[in-house]
Amino acid sequence: MLNSWVVMPACLPLVRRRCTTCTSERFRASGRFRVNAHHKLLDVWLLVLCTSCGQTAKLTVLERRNVRSLRPELLDRLHANDPALTAELLRDPVMLRRNRAALDWDGAWRLDTGGSDHLDREVIDIAVRFAAPIPLRPVRLIAEGCGLSRAEVERLLAEGKLVSAVRLSGKLSGDFTFTLKR
């Protein structure tokens, strides 16, 4: 029987970007937007705070966009500092690339295994689904979900008792399945 695990964000990830005031490279999203108007053109930034010194930095969301080109719902969400919009924009790879930033997902995700009653079977088939594109090592997920050490998961992988259609040695952010034979 195929069991299903879900990797879900537990909170907003930290933003990796160098602080201009201190040597820290971690910022947390404040959840606030700065909307600035130049006649009919808008600039929009997502404000982030340095975790070390508290300095505010801006991540560019929109630059010199005509007000009429924006959907009114988006403008309302920006003015209301919508937390869901903050999460959406932080997952946008184009915005991150434009701002030369990356995300640090350490401690910002959780694994929902649906219970541990399936772990005592001889053969376990599991489908892992990602609710958001969180780059994680499958070995770490399997170790956490099965209650094993990562070294033990690596050993099972080397012995051929842990098999998958995808490579389990790098980072993944997409759905995959695996079979564990004990």
Describe the predicted segments one by one.
Residues 43-45, 123-125, 175:
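A generic structural signal for beta-strand entry/edge sites
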Residues 7-14, 20-21, 122-125, 136-143:
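A broad, low-specificity signal for short, low-complexity segments enriched in glycine/proline
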Residues 116-117, 179-182:
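A cross-kingdom feature marking charged/low-complexity
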Residues 63-130, 134-135:
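Extended interfacial segments that mediate partner engagement and assembly in macromolecular machines
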Residues 51, 127, 179:
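Residues in well-ordered beta-strands of folded domains
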Residues 130-178:
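A basic, amphipathic helix-loop patch mediating RNA/tRNA/ribosome contacts
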Residues 1-84:
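N-terminal cysteine/histidine-rich coordination modules
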Residues 10, 41, 117-119, 169-171:
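Sterically constrained small-residue positions within well-ordered secondary structures
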